[in-house]
Amino acid sequence: MLYQSETLQLHWLENGIAELVFDAPGSVNKLDTKTVANLGEALNVLEKQSELKGLLLRSAKTALIVGADITEFLSLFNAPPEKLHQWLVFANTIFNRLEDLPVPTISAINGYALGGGCECILATDFRIASPEARIGLPETKLGIMPGFGGSVRLPRLLGADSALEIIATGKDVTANDALKIGLVDAVVDPEKLVGSALTMLKQAIDGKLDWQAARRPKLEPLKLNPTEAAMCFTIAKGRVMQVAGKHYPAPLTAVKTIEAAAKFGRTEALNLETNSFVPLAGSNEARALVGIFLNDQYVKAQAKKLSKGVAAPKLAAVLGAGIMGGGIAYQSALKSVPVIMKDINENSLDLGMNEAAKLLNKQLERGKVDGLKMASILATIRPTLDYAGIERAQVIVEAVVENPKVKAAVLAEVEALIGEDTVLASNTSTIPIDQLAKSLKRPENFCGMHFFNPVHQMPLVEIIRGAKTSDKTLAAVVAYATQMGKTPIVVNDCPGFFVNRVLFPYLAGFGMLVRDGGDFHQIDKVMEKQFGWPMGPAYLLDVVGIDTAHHAQAVMAAGFPERMNKDYRDAVDVMFDNQRFGQKNGQGFYRYTQDAKGKPRKENDEQVDKLLAEISQPLQEFSDEDIIARTMIPMINEVVRCLEEGIIASAAEGDMALVYGLGFPPFHGGVFRYLDTLGSANYVEMAQRYAHLGALYHVPAGLRAKAEHNESYYPVAAALLDVSTNQPA
């Protein structure tokens, strides 16, 4: 053994060939600060070996390196900029030393080589992969860019076009695609991977493969003539702005950095990469996007903990077909849980089956399933007009019309037909679970399971715990949601639960703004373009359905009269009274026609301004800041109340529910991350200016206390860098 640390080992293989094996504690290898330092120490040893002829780099695990340790990111980013800069120079010196070894080097890639793992293999002369390998640089998805030479080496290895696509999108590539673009030199069966890498290395040692020619382009300027460069980078910047937009600066920064570095060799190009990385790392967007990644891991770990030892059901049932029931049945069947889909109406069953078939056809068109697989999935959905066989289902999801009497009757009816251990769940969006539980003899077996529409696209499922819901019931439903490929978040019961409870104050803020003379077109534009919502409040209401929103608004007003009851007609009332229900009947705040693909196309409708004049002050222009404040303060206050009341268990779960359930702009990170970015004292001061608008604008006591004590919702990460050495502490 030449060198051994907690994360990697270096030893001789044969005839002057050394092997560097990544083998960290735990299930995967990460390129954390400790591993980077260990790599430097291993190279110290290797550089002294006069008999060294070649180096093979591989993993002892099922993946090479899954990336940097993202749990360290916020700490790294909190270091003073000059210290982060110095540490990146320190880390890059190590990768340069790996690249500059006076012998040929090869990486054997199994599983993932992502982020820092990809940058590590780029520093070797050759790369060979097994078929299941996936290689990529996902940094831009986290609000940063490659920092260990990825933006320098990848374009020089592949050419600018392919490299820009990988770096700007953050998508990884398969082994075969990597072979096509020149990212790897060969793809071999897993059992032959190390042997083939060794053979290739020996060929390089014997002069049959020119390893110096493989290395040289990575050290030199990018080979592009001025016309090619202008064309390539102009197109890339245009595409990035179209897809990422102004709220996500990392992809554009990466493209501009690669462009600026194109005319330089490795040293100057790496300096440019580091100079671009440091400001991105200190940005609010990076903190928010890294926070989302960490929160996602946290909520998935919570789900795993809750459902520990509980298997997903072998058979499920959905009561109520149609679009929603069909969507739930499709998702269940797609993820290998057969499902009974029961309805009282043959047409609804047809609609549900058609919805499932339509979604599977899309999968077929994309090559995700073949005809045989599609048929077998559809065969696991059993449409029925009666309850035959329902007693065999372990989890039954009621998804009938959003009416408490109808839901209660259906739940009581099915409970009489099933065993004492069968779990019942209601897919309701606003009706309190404890209210529905009153109709049941076994309320401990009952909870809420709130799916979001469209079911196949929306990652969140709210699991609602009633006062009598047992842990066993929660575990079964969480296990089912997880098996369905969803992110379940458990919330406590109240009207609207969490997501809808916090959505309606936002929509109420919109309604008050329109009442006071705000132009809904301007409001939508500001909330989309400036704040970053996927759609503004008027457009969202049209998509949700004005009738649905009108009903839910009444439920919320009854549940929280002190804040959500109103003594005036608002824009939703006007739309509802004029039977303008949104996309579902082609007219709401906007008019809808079908485009060539049959999708709704939004158009302005002059009639709407006339209708809204009944309930509005004369139109006036509000500032962007006013529009954002007047719509967002009610939502933010309600989100905070939900945490203070224990409706949600943590800031992390609240933020992920907002991002996954409502499309809250990821670059803000969720309400709690947004509050931490603004500063609680700054927020309270801002909200105070709007307090005259009513109870929705009154800041909860807990948030006021945080502001007084200058506290945040997320812990402030301590800097990880040892300032005396610029190395990991």
From Swiss-Prot:
GO terms for biological process: fatty acid beta-oxidation. Pathway: Lipid metabolism; fatty acid beta-oxidation. SUPFAM superfamilies: 6-phosphogluconate dehydrogenase C-terminal domain-like (SSF48179), ClpP/crotonase (SSF52096), NAD(P)-binding Rossmann-fold domains (SSF51735). Keywords: Fatty acid metabolism, Isomerase, Lipid degradation, Lipid metabolism, Lyase, Multifunctional enzyme, NAD, Oxidoreductase. Residues 311-729 are annotated as: 3-hydroxyacyl-CoA dehydrogenase. This is Fatty acid oxidation complex subunit alpha. Substrate binds at residues 296, 500, 660. The record marks 119, 139 as: Important for catalytic activity. Gene3D superfamilies: 1.10.1040.50, 2-enoyl-CoA Hydratase, Chain A, domain 1, NAD(P)-binding Rossmann-like Domain. The keyword Lipid metabolism applies. GO terms for molecular function: 3-hydroxybutyryl-CoA epimerase activity; delta(3)-delta(2)-enoyl-CoA isomerase activity; enoyl-CoA hydratase activity; long-chain-3-hydroxyacyl-CoA dehydrogenase activity; NAD+ binding. Pfam families: 3HCDH, 3HCDH_N, ECH_1. GO terms for cellular component: fatty acid beta-oxidation multienzyme complex. Signal peptide: none annotated. The active site is at 450 (for 3-hydroxyacyl-coa dehydrogenase activity). In the N-terminal section; belongs to the enoyl-CoA hydratase/isomerase family. It comes from Yersinia pseudotuberculosis serotype IB (strain PB1/+). It catalyses: a (3S)-3-hydroxyacyl-CoA + NAD(+) = a 3-oxoacyl-CoA + NADH + H(+); a (3S)-3-hydroxyacyl-CoA = a (2E)-enoyl-CoA + H2O; a 4-saturated-(3S)-3-hydroxyacyl-CoA = a (3E)-enoyl-CoA + H2O; (3S)-3-hydroxybutanoyl-CoA = (3R)-3-hydroxybutanoyl-CoA. Residues 1-189 are annotated as: Enoyl-CoA hydratase/isomerase.
